[in-house]
């Protein structure tokens, strides 16, 4: 009915406005299967305060207001929003080949960080998992490394580590198919986070040093990428903030020889971070980098290893 059509239009308009998807009226007609979109919007007097329809575009007047409304579940339930997004993803799956715009929309709609942003980082575990489960068999998703990496990240965020491990395995398998020249630096960083957080969550001291050594190796194996992709160089420091919790939980209680292995890697990360900071102005240094520096200083100070 007309009210249902209006709600679907507004949900897509809000998501598109928040994520800047660049969809026009024709895209709305195709993706929502509603041909009289302009009339549906204009027939509702209150819509004029929220969205504009002009020059073939549907514009949200304020992405901030759109975000506030998306977070109010009494207006749009999470279930309703995800149902609209699932229907749109199914439509896009038949349209994205040959369309960079639609391909980009699909990338946005499976990005963990973007979806979390739409919902104000209020993640309901069952709803997010249901969403990814509903779209994982789409042609765009099932062989898509980015999709499985994002699904794994969602599972880490929701502390579903067994699932995360399976989906990282799928992502690495797809990365391997791209050949030895493909760099999996992004997956490596997220997988390192998975290794550390999984070990911390279950408080498993047995094997914890081996896990730490592997996580540290993954964070540091892509030094050439650190140089080329300057915008992504902070990723490993964001993950390495967990070294402090790892020290408090496990490493502070290690035998001296094992503790030395741990501390040498902390020194290596600290040296790398200081070198990284030298290339930045003070206002360019991200908060997570500062937090990592503080965490590493805490560890090295505690063991009198800070020169």
Where are these regions (language model features)?
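Alpha-helical repeat scaffolds
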Residues: 85-88, 123-138, 162-174, 203-226, ...
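Residue signature of alpha-solenoid helical repeat architecture, marking inter-repeat boundaries
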Residues: 141-142, 182, 230, 234
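The tetratricopeptide repeat
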Residues: 147, 185-189, 232-242, 285
């Amino acid at each position: 009915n007309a009210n249902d059509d209006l709600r679907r239009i507004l949900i897509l308009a809000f998501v598109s406005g928040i994520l800047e998807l660049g969809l026009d009226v024709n895209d709305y007609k195709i993706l929502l299967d509603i041909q009289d979109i302009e009339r549906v919007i204009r027939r509702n007097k209150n819509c004029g305060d929220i969205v504009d329809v002009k020059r073939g575009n549907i514009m949200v007047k304020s992405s901030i207001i759109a975000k506030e409304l998306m977070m109010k579940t009494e207006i749009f339930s999470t279930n309703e929003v995800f149902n609209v997004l699932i229907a749109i993803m199914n439509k896009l799956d038949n349209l994205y080949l040959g369309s960079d715009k639609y391909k980009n929309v699909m990338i946005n709609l499976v990005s963990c960080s973007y979806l979390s942003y739409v919902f104000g980082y209020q993640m309901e575990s069952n709803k997010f998992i249901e969403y990814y489960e509903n779209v994982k068999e789409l042609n765009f998703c099932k062989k898509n490394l980015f999709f499985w990496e994002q699904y794994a990240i969602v599972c880490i965020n929701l502390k579903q580590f067994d699932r995360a491990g399976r989906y990282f395995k799928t992502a690495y398998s797809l990365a391997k198919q791209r050949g030895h020249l493909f760099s999996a630096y992004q997956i490596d960083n997220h997988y390192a986070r998975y290794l550390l957080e999984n070990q911390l969550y279950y408080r498993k001291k047995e094997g914890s040093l081996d896990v730490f050594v592997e996580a540290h190796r993954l964070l540091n194996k892509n030094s050439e990428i650190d140089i080329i992709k300057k915008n992504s160089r902070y990723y490993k420091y964001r993950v390495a903030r967990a070294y402090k919790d790892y020290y408090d939980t496990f490493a502070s209680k290690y035998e001296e020889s094992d503790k030395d292995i741990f501390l040498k890697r902390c020194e290596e990360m600290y040296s790398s971070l200081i070198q990284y900071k030298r290339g930045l102005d003070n206002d360019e240094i991200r908060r997570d980098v500062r937090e990592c520096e503080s965490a590493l200083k805490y560890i090295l100070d505690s063991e009198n290893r800070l020169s």
